[in-house]
Amino acid sequence: MSKLLQPLKFNCGLEMKNRFMLAPLTNTQSHSDGVLSEEEFNWLEMRAAGGFGLTMTCAAHVQAIGQGFPGQLGVFSDAHLKGLTKLAGAIKSHGSIAICQIHHAGIRSPKELVGEQPVG
């Protein structure tokens, strides 16, 4: 149990302040175009402020046609950069490592959500 509070250093040079990591949870709080919402920003920042050594976003789709669920965070457009940059800065300001889980739903992308036949 004592190791949980010890730092963890990765070969790449990053170091977690402790060994607590926020798993990528699907919270469906982003806007329909994948832009980070204030609610999702606040939720993730609160996790970092709470002491996680690593804070990971929900699954963020890398292509519009790869969206898997409504309210999914996007990382495929310049329109997403402002919110993602703000989020990374906020997470880091609490001493937590910011990680974005990337995702493509492929054939499981709902046609009614992406507007066309999914890739598969």
Which residues are covered by each model-predicted region?
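Flavin-dependent oxidoreductase catalytic cores
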Residues: 1-120
